[in-house]
Amino acid sequence: MGSTFSGIELGKRSIMAHTDAISTAGHNISNANTEGYSRQRVQLKEFDPLYRPELERPERAGMIGQGIDVQSINRVRDEMLDQRITAQQNQESYWDTRSKYYTMIEQIYNEPDEVSVRSNMDKFWESWQELSMNPESQAARQAVVTRGESLTDAIKSKWENLMGVGSLLNSDIDSTVKQVNSYANQIAALNSEIIRSRGMGDNPNDLLDRRDLLVDKLSKLANITTDQRDPDEFMVHLDGKVLVQGGIARNFDLVSLTDNNGYEKLVWADTREDAFVSGGTLGALIELRDVDIRNEIQSLNTMTMNFSDLVNDVHRNAYGANNVTGLDFFTQHSFVENVNGNFDRDGDGNFDHSYIFRFTGTTTLNPQEQIGFEGVMTFSGPSGNVQVPYHPTDTVETVINRINDSNGEVKAYLDRNNNLVLKGTTAQNVENPDFVIRHVEDSGFFLTGYSGILSASGADGAYDFAHADAVNSLAGAQFAVSPVLNPAGYIEVNNVIKNDVKSVAAAFRDDSGNVNAGDARAAVEIASIRNTKVMIGHERTLDDYFADSVTNVGLKGEQAENNLKSHMAIMNDLRTMRDSISGVNIDEELSDIIKFQHGYNAAAKFVTIWDSLIDTVINRLGV
């Protein structure tokens, strides 16, 4: 027969099981508002029954139940849903970051008319137009100087605002990288704790919740995926690279760049290799700083560099009312100081590069003339060199267009004297300097004897900026050194002109070499730059530049806002779904507590009854 005391053990197990169930429900209620908490459920099962192989077995039940047992306490989670949220969440934070920063950029472009670059540029051209109609008027010359100063102030103000956004982005990148490193280290530490806990037979639900919360936060910062092929090794991958493997975490570091406004690039701390992050807050911040803001600053610098160079080219060849000539109207205070463009790029005290912005050939060319020979020109490009071929039937204009249509970071045009001009553009790679011609080579004669830029054909006669005195490869061509810093941040009206407005040059010498006080041909030529294709990145006028800039910023801002709304709607649905599965419902937990309380009370009553039965056997049989 069964043990007389077996009922006490059975009742004890029931009381303990219902106690655990009530405690778990209370734990759920306590953490109803805890971020990342998943509700827990007690998994109950029948305790192993007794198998009694006795002689009377055929006449009686052979297996006697022993009550209940707590099998485990588990979190209520949907792993597939969690993985989907992890994959989707980085896109929401990516577009949220872009939307926030494009709001700032749009504010820079939506500045009031009286201080905008475009408005002041229009007034600057109008002042030259007025001077062309009144070349003997000192008031008209003063207007040119005053409006020139207003224009440079507007350009510098816009540059400072864009640089301010860039600095803010750089600061945000720094703090976000620290967050990523912190989350990765915490996840690795939790992995070790979870493995130890499971090794002792525990089910570390709260540790798992903390790890999942960190993964959630990390997925907002970068494009990550998780997997656990080995039950004891939880892994986090970032854009295909291992970030966390079990108890080991990799970290990021930031390294300053010489030619990127002092900004820093992201590298892996252990290997020092470049790290690439797409998606998430960090991916958006890096893209905004190194692509969007960099493009806006480069665009402003390109406009400033080209328009001032064109104005100066006319002005220095013209004469003022005081017969002064050779003056640039605009000056920069940040050009390479060495006359040959030699520059110490690595900071070791020795010249190691040549920073040249513009070459001007020595030969006057006819744009419609067929060149009559063939060859291949080589120019520096975004990643390596770019080759541009030419053929005997090509005209000069065709060859120039082919250069400009190529992916080379050099642009070409014929100047006012029909001499070929090559100019360095902004660099796509952040590690290359802007407005620096890095490589020019010609296997034939177009850039050598025909246009008068290079002294010899082939590799031996090539110009390459990677050493000092590279200008020695030029065939007497004029050249202009490059700016070291941003042209838009340091442009000014020449102090000589500001101190004496008569130095504003509006006239050219006539055929006899005399300067006529009523001549205004230079003023007309400068005023006409407004509607001339001046090679701002592509063949565009200054008006085209301003229209394109505002349109591009507006479209990108609209794109960010629309994509943010779309991803927010998706994420709201996914979070609602997860909350319905893993979230704590107070009413449901209270209902469970009442249910388990009744079970507890019944088990206690059962123990009391069994106690009375034992008391009868022990004390009341009268034996």
Residues covered by each model-derived region:
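Structural signature of extracellular appendage/secretion-system components
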Residues: 1-623
